[in-house]
């Protein structure tokens, strides 16, 4: 029972910490833009600050995850992130939001991300990596959908019955309620994390062991291939942030219905991630990823051409939900490549930090690029160009998977160093 309680805790912590910086923009983008008075370009630049700070934090975060208790690292991160929401609720300007997102780039990554990945890998064991990461991603999807549904209810509560008649003040009040919901959720989850995660940590016997992983992983081709896969997959995930805006500007929905469409998509996440995890364990994580990229290439190409008229509307909805499934399938298994690539367990944090450092660089470039794509051609033209950009990224992902498969045919064990002297000790209070 405690084993599954641990995974449930990791699931909720792993999703709630990203609620403030990402859920607010993914599910409520039209409302956020109106409430803050931002353009797509300005919001994209704010996200670029987050991405820059996160990129700096990923690699040292991996080293810390190999040294310190996941319980301590996750708890501090959740509290620090939740506190930042109280500042967001004051509606700072673009500079204030840029500083806040830079702060979140540190609080959500430095002490959190690699620790989460390491804890999940250890939970799964060598035989069930696809299942472990599939359950993590799928469970995070359930948590995201549940909190998005609750947040939509909060937004609707404060909005007038006819959302199109909402005043600026009503919209700001409603969105403030959404922000505070995610803030308190992060803090409450921090308390649960401290109570439910065992207080164990890994302790090295010298300063050499602290930086040993950082020194060796950068020369491993398999690490770079996995990082490139994450870049392409994460662009697809970031692409989901546009769907609520697409629903409003192209499909003619109001803000609440646009947010609801994205929330419905989030409910696909657990099914897609868990299914992909089981397939990866029985078949291959890399081949599962290749199939997912192929599906995305087709769906993005269709969305770049489809018009919301007659049967075209059905084509759009079908491809939207298929793309949700393929993106979440990718996220469910790309960290299972740690085991498929035979990554030594003592280097899990360092490799996770390295592939995240490189793989999540779309946090820096994706939103500024796509924000400018949308603003350059307002309306359906901008959104079609947006999907065309995503199709190109998916095609690149297919080629990267082919490269990874070729690397895996070599003797991967020979590419890794031997384990330095490390001990396991319980955390002292």
Locate the predicted segments by residue:
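Cytoplasmic membrane-interface "Motif A"-like loop-to-helix N-cap segments
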Residues: 67-78, 281-295
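Juxtamembrane intracellular "pre-TM" segments in multi-pass secondary transporters
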Residues: 1, 198-226, 422-429
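Extracytoplasmic gate region of multi-pass secondary transporters
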Residues: 25-29, 144, 148, 221-273, ...
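C-terminal membrane-cytosol helix-exit motif in multi-pass small-molecule transporters
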Residues: 151-160, 183-203, 400-405
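Helix-to-loop junctions at the C-terminal end of transmembrane segments
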Residues: 56-69, 272-285, 374-375
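C-terminal transmembrane helical hairpin of 12-TM major facilitator-type secondary transporters
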Residues: 284-337
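A late C-terminal transmembrane helix in Major Facilitator Superfamily
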Residues: 342-378
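Glycine-rich segments within core transmembrane alpha-helices of 12-TM secondary carriers
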Residues: 131-156, 356-367
């Amino acid at each position: 029972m405690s084993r599954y309680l641990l995974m449930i805790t990791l699931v909720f912590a792993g999703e709630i910490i990203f609620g403030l910086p990402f859920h607010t923009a993914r599910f409520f983008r039209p409302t956020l833009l109106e409430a803050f008075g931002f353009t797509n370009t300005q919001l994209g630049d704010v996200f670029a600050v987050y991405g820059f700070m996160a990129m700096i934090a990923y690699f040292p975060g991996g080293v810390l995850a190999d040294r310190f208790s996941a319980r301590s690292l996750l708890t501090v991160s959740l509290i620090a992130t939740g506190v930042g929401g109280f500042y967001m609720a004051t509606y700072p300007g673009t500079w204030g939001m840029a500083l806040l997102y830079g702060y979140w780039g540190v609080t959500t990554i430095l002490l959190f991300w690699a620790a989460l990945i390491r804890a999940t890998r250890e939970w799964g064991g060598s035989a069930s990596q696809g299942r472990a990461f599939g359950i993590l991603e799928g469970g995070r999807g359930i948590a995201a959908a549940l909190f998005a549904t609750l947040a939509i209810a909060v937004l609707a509560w404060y909005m007038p019955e006819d959302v199109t008649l909402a005043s600026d003040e009503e919209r700001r009040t409603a969105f403030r309620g959404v922000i505070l919901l995610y803030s308190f959720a992060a803090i409450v989850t921090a308390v649960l994390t401290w109570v439910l995660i065992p207080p164990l940590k890994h302790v090295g016997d010298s300063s050499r062991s602290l930086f040993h992983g950082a020194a060796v992983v950068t020369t491993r081709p398999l690490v770079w291939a996995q990082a490139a896969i994450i870049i392409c997959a994460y662009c697809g995930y970031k692409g989901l942030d546009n769907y609520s805006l697409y629903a409003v500007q192209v499909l003619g929905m109001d803000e609440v219905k646009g947010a609801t469409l994205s929330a419905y998509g989030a409910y696909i996440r657990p099914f897609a991630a868990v299914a992909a995890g089981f397939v990866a364990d029985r078949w291959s994580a890399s081949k599962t990823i290749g199939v997912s990229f192929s599906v995305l290439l087709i769906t993005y190409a269709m969305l770049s051409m489809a018009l919301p008229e007659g049967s075209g509307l059905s084509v759009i909805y079908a491809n939207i939900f298929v793309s949700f499934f393929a993106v979440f399938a990718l996220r469910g298994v790309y960290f299972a490549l740690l085991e498929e690539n035979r990554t030594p367990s003592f280097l899990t944090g360092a490799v996770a930090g390295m592939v995240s450092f490189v793989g999540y660089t779309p946090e820096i470039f994706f939103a500024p690029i796509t924000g400018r794509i949308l603003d350059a051609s307002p309306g359906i033209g901008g959104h079609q160009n947006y999907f065309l950009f995503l199709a190109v990224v998916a095609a690149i992902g297919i080629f990267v998977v082919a490269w990874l498969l070729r690397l895996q045919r070599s003797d991967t064990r020979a590419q890794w160093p031997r384990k330095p002297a490390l001990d396991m000790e319980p955390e002292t209070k």
